[in-house]
A protein has these predicted regions:
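Short amphipathic alpha-helical "recognition" segments used for binding
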Residues: 7-8, 29
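N-terminal secretory signal peptides that target proteins for export/translocation
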Residues: 1-7
Length: 540
């Protein structure tokens, strides 16, 4: 460990001048900013790097060209890293355990020191067991949500359909309350069953033996169980990345169908909740009432912006509509939660995706189908730029590939703006999981089939496309005149940003790149399924 620290210190000294010349900003949340537009003003980022050879242990891979450090994660990583206050937080799974007391399939949030990747602590959450009508925590996915950090607190949605507030110091500085039952919370349950009672989801659970806590365990400040508190029935995964504004925490719920995929157990459950960030108290729920219109599940994340003096919260619904809500909830009465009032909604499915020959087109949920035209939900995050919202539609990747759509809508409208708010639609892409990025009059988007699209932001006309021939889960990230794009086959593509298509480099990684690269304080962070890389031009 001492050798690692010395090597990291020497590397830091060598590249300090290079880093200080770049933008010195943290990246504290999904998208880096409330608009969720995946664009950074960082400069001096590398065009390429060499990931190096795999090391044994937990330190990732051997140092190589333009790599400041690398550190091992689990073996499936879908949530992006965030960097704040000298720490890095990233969700992964437990296939590469850092603590022998935590075995088996679990969701994990790891915390590292930003300067040298020293492991600080981890949140290790037991999986929810599938069975009967329940399949809300798909095997091996880990914690898929990207956390949000503000000051001394880290907020994240866990794989157990719960929002937790964590102390960024972990348990190293003691177990702060009010939540103090971490030992039992982290225990592997002996038995567990989820029942969809009419009154709300019910859990029959034998909690198992409490674990012995240590300084590298997470310190939970408070916990909000969405199944218990607002009757959410999660489908496949809980993946919303929370958004902080003032004292409010905005969270999308993972409510969806049950294991039969033909029934929504709790259609009255909210799409969005607002919590007090200090206490976890439920303050408000949305009034869109989409529960019985959910196609499959809800996996989008909220974005936020001020439009004509009014702060709006945007969210991609499980019914294929993009919604805008007034970000200031109306207070509740008689002990009931307040209301997030809908300002507008926009149908992101073109009419021909929903109706054919005067008849409704059924939602296509057959695994392995190809080219079948059908309506889709929104999995990506709505991206805001210059009073416009950009968002793609998509489906579970197991449903196969089929036509998708990138929509651009006018955020200044009100009501049902499916027609009045439509600026353009781009239908030359397939279903997408990716959040678009808007920079210098261009929109960069990717579809699951592996095609990267560059579209004119004003007209919606294609500027260029590039087929990576590799499935894409991640989102395009734009910085320093480059577009970084990861693929499931394990490559990081680097394109020149602009109207002329140019592939700068294609970097072979050690595993799938399903999370989105980010930059903070002059460093480019690239997560593969297995490893997080800190990339700096000139590092050796």
């Amino acid at each position: 460990m001492a050798d690692k620290r010395v090597a990291a210190w020497v590397t830091a000294v060598c590249v300090a001048g290079l880093v200080s010349a770049a933008a010195g900003k943290d990246w504290p949340q999904w998208g880096g900013q409330d608009s969720k537009n995946m664009v950074s003003d960082a400069k001096g980022l590398p065009d390429a790097f060499d990931p190096g050879e795999r090391r044994s242990g937990k330190t990732g891979r051997a140092a190589s060209k333009n790599v400041k450090w690398s550190v091992a994660l689990g073996k499936q990583t879908y949530g992006g890293p965030v960097i704040a206050g000298g720490r890095i937080f990233v969700g992964t799974n437990n296939d590469n355990p850092r603590d022998r007391k935590y075995r088996g399939d679990r969701g994990v949030l790891m915390c590292f020191r930003e300067s040298d990747a020293e492991f600080l602590w981890q949140l290790v959450v037991p999986k929810m067991r599938a069975g009967g009508k329940f399949n809300g925590d798909f095997a091996k996915l880990g914690i898929c949500a990207t956390p949000a950090v503000e000051g001394k607190r880290c907020y994240v949605v866990t794989n157990r359909c719960a929002v937790v507030c964590l102390d960024v110091e972990g348990l190293a500085n003691g177990n702060d309350g009010p939540f103090t039952d971490e030992a039992q919370s982290y225990a592997w349950p002996i038995g567990e069953k989820y029942i969809d009672d009419p009154a709300g989801p019910r859990v029959v659970r034998d909690p198992g033996k409490p674990v012995k806590l240590g300084p590298t365990d997470a310190d939970i400040i408070w916990r909000f169980d969405m199944m218990k508190e607002v009757s959410v029935w999660p489908q496949d995964a809980s993946s919303c990345s929370v958004l902080i504004r003032g004292d409010y925490l905005y969270v999308g719920t993972p409510n969806g169908v049950d294991r039969s995929h033909n029934r929504i157990p709790y259609p009255d459950a909210p799409m969005l909740v607002v919590l007090n960030k200090h206490t976890g108290k439920l303050l408000a729920v949305d009034n869109a009432g989409i529960g019985d219109r959910i196609y499959h599940g809800q996996w989008s994340s909220p974005s936020l912006a001020t439009v004509n003096g009014r702060t709006l919260l945007f969210y991609g619904g499980g019914d294929g509509f993009c919604y805008a809500f007034d970000a200031e909830p109306e207070p509740g009465k008689g002990g009931k939660p307040g209301t997030l009032k809908m300002v507008w909604k926009f149908d992101c499915n073109p009419p021909e995706y929903k109706t054919k020959d005067g008849k409704p087109v059924k939602y296509q949920k057959k695994h392995g189908s190809k080219g079948v035209l059908s309506p889709c939900e929104i999995i990506a995050t709505p991206a805001f730029h210059d009073n416009r919202v950009y968002v793609t539609i998509g489906q579970d990747t197991r449903h196969g590939v089929a036509p998708g759509c990138l929509s651009c809508m006018d955020a200044t409208k009100t009501g049902d703006i499916s027609k009045s708010g439509l600026i353009w639609r781009y239908t030359a892409l397939d279903r997408s999981l990716s959040t678009p990025a808007v920079a210098d009059g261009l929109v960069y988007a990717a579809d699951y089939t592996g095609i990267v699209h560059c579209v004119d932001a004003k007209t919606g006309k294609a500027v260029w496309t590039h087929d990576t021939k590799q499935h894409i889960w991640a989102s395009p990230f734009v910085a320093d005149g480059k577009v970084y794009m990861g693929t499931e086959r394990g490559y990081l593509w680097v394109f020149a940003a602009g109207r002329e298509k140019k592939v700068i480099s294609r970097i072979r990684m050690d595993g799938a790149v399903c999370a989105t690269p980010v930059t903070a304080n002059g460093v480019l962070y690239v997560p593969s399924h297995k490893t997080l890389y800190a990339v700096v031009k000139g590092a050796e």
